[in-house]
């Protein structure tokens, strides 16, 4: 991934992911031994972690840090759901599901809990001397996608490349989307819930743009949000570049 100055993001240092509970032994071997994973940042709420805990006991070499972007009361539709609760919500939904998700993104970037989490996220990025850092939420696209937006922007990656990376979520989500769609179809709910299904399980340009526009409206630019909102000064951005670019 190339920056506007022609530098590149170092491979195997910055990793975004969905929940980790289903990691195989081989997955853990690759992350710990090949990627030299040293820190995992969990952006989910306590309740989400209880439902799908990280495999901490299987990765003793790794430090796990909990940085919830939402409070329990605010997490709403981004909360971990089973298929039946998803179907119930989708069948009762009256508002445009894409609009619902778009409205979540500004809060997930600018909310008090989110700002607190992203400040600590950058502290960890600045403090880690070696090895990889992995951050994740439940699906790996909303909270995790915004964290990726922030670090990549801070490193000077152009917006179109950041968007391309964000939308790559849809490639990796196809298997899950097919499985959930099959459950909908089996229970004769696909026609009623298919749009909502796509809205909540896929990445859309409008989602990330909604967050960026909210930051620009409040701070003037994403750069100003980084500096004024999160305390990422030009000096800190230079340190990040030294660590994660070549």
What residues fall within each predicted segment?
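Ser/Thr-glycine-rich phosphate-binding loops at phosphate-binding pockets of nucleotides
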Residues: 139, 143-144
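Cys-dependent protein tyrosine phosphatase-like superfamily
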Residues: 1-134, 147-246
């Amino acid at each position: 991934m190339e920056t506007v100055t022609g530098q590149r993001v170092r491979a195997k240092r910055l990793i975004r992911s969905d929940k980790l509970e289903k990691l195989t032994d081989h997955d853990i071997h690759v992350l710990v031994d090949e990627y030299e994973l040293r820190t995992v940042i969990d952006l989910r709420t306590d309740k989400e972690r209880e439902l799908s805990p990280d495999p901490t006991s299987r990765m003793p070499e790794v430090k796990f840090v909990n940085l919830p972007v939402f409070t329990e009361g605010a997490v709403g539709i981004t909360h971990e759901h089973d298929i039946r609760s998803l179907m119930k919500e989708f069948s009762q939904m009256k508002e445009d599901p894409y609009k619902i998700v778009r409205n979540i993104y500004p809060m997930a970037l600018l909310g008090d809990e989110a700002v607190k989490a992203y400040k600590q996220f950058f502290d960890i990025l600045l403090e880690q001397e070696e090895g990889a850092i992995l951050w994740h939420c439940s699906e790996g696209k909303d909270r995790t996608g915004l964290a990726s937006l922030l670090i990549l922007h801070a490193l000077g990656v152009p917006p179109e490349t950041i968007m391309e990376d964000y939308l790559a979520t849809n490639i990796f989500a196809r298997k899950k989307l097919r499985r959930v769609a099959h459950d909908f179809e089996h229970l004769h709910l696909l026609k009623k819930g298919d749009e909502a299904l796509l809205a909540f399980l896929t990445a859309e340009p409008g989602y990330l743009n909604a967050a960026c526009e909210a930051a620009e409206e409040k701070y003037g630019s994403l750069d100003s949000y980084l500096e004024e909102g999160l305390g990422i000064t030009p000096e800190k951005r230079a340190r990040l570049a030294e660590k994660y670019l070549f």
